[in-house]
């Protein structure tokens, strides 16, 4: 599946949000490319909604067609569509690996999952979009644990801040999904109601 692989900082500046996490270049220049020193142009309601959708897509590394499927599923489920959408995005396996501190970025987490380094409930899963469920157990495969990266990740877990809905066992690199996240537990600068308004037109 094709994905945006261009300069992450440029995309972050255009959408005014750090899509990478800890991007020093974005912190220095948080305004859109080509707008240095210019007053912000008043944006239309449609443009704001579109930007919010793009922000969510690029934050989680999802193409438009797949994102539409997420929205359709969120709309089908009971409850608030926006909340459901954010829970679906946050429950992707690659995002869980990132949230647990086993990858520096979601892009790296996606690569680690795609290369088959993880199991879910004892079964190998190499699909980044795999939806985790409550009580799932995610492990690094035995042969993968010998990789230098996982040695470094294991050391870094001592300082990792893990969301309350997850638990990480540093000694085994095991991730426990105690529950699916609630919207209040998802710390991303996305106004999902604007996305709902975008697709409701």
Swiss-Prot record:
CDD domains attached to this UniProt entry: S4
Domain S4 RNA-binding: 91-151
SMART domains: Ribosomal_S4, S4
Keyword entries, A-Z: Ribonucleoprotein, Ribosomal protein, RNA-binding, rRNA-binding
One Gene Ontology term from the biological process aspect of the record: translation
One GO location term (cellular component): small ribosomal subunit
GO terms for MF: rRNA binding; structural constituent of ribosome
Subunit details: Part of the 30S ribosomal subunit. Contacts protein S5. The interaction surface between S4 and S5 is involved in control of translational fidelity.
Function according to Swiss-Prot or TrEMBL: One of the primary rRNA binding proteins, it binds directly to 16S rRNA where it nucleates assembly of the body of the 30S subunit. With S5 and S12 plays an important role in translational accuracy.
UniProt cross-references to HAMAP family, sorted A to Z: Ribosomal_uS4_B (MF_01306_B)
Similarity annotation: Belongs to the universal ribosomal protein uS4 family.
Record NCBIfam families: PRK05327.1, rpsD_bact
Protein name per UniProt: Small ribosomal subunit protein uS4
Organism: Corynebacterium kroppenstedtii (strain DSM 44385 / JCM 11950 / CIP 105744 / CCUG 35717)
Gene, per the UniProt record: rpsD
């Amino acid at each position: 599946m094709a994905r945006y692989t261009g300069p992450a900082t440029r995309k972050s500046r255009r959408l005014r949000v750090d899509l990478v996490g800890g991007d020093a270049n974005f912190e220095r220049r948080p305004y859109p490319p080509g707008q240095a020193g210019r007053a912000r142009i008043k944006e239309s309601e449609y443009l704001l909604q579109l930007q919010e959708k793009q922000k969510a897509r690029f934050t989680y590394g999802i193409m438009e067609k797949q994102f539409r499927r997420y929205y359709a599923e969120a709309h089908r489920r009971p409850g608030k569509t926006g909340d459901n959408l954010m829970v679906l995005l946050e429950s992707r396996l690659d995002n869980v690996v990132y949230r647990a501190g086993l990858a520096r970025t979601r892009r790296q987490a996606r690569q680690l999952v795609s290369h088959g380094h993880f199991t879910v409930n004892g079964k190998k899963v190499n699909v980044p979009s795999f939806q985790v469920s409550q009580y799932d157990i995610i492990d690094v495969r035995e042969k993968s644990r010998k990789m230098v990266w996982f040695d470094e990740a294991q050391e870094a877990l001592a300082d990792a801040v893990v969301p309350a809905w997850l638990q990480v066992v540093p000694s085994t690199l095991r991730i426990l999904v105690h529950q699916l996240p609630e919207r209040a537990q998802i710390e991303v600068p996305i106004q999902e109601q604007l996305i709902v308004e975008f697709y409701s037109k």
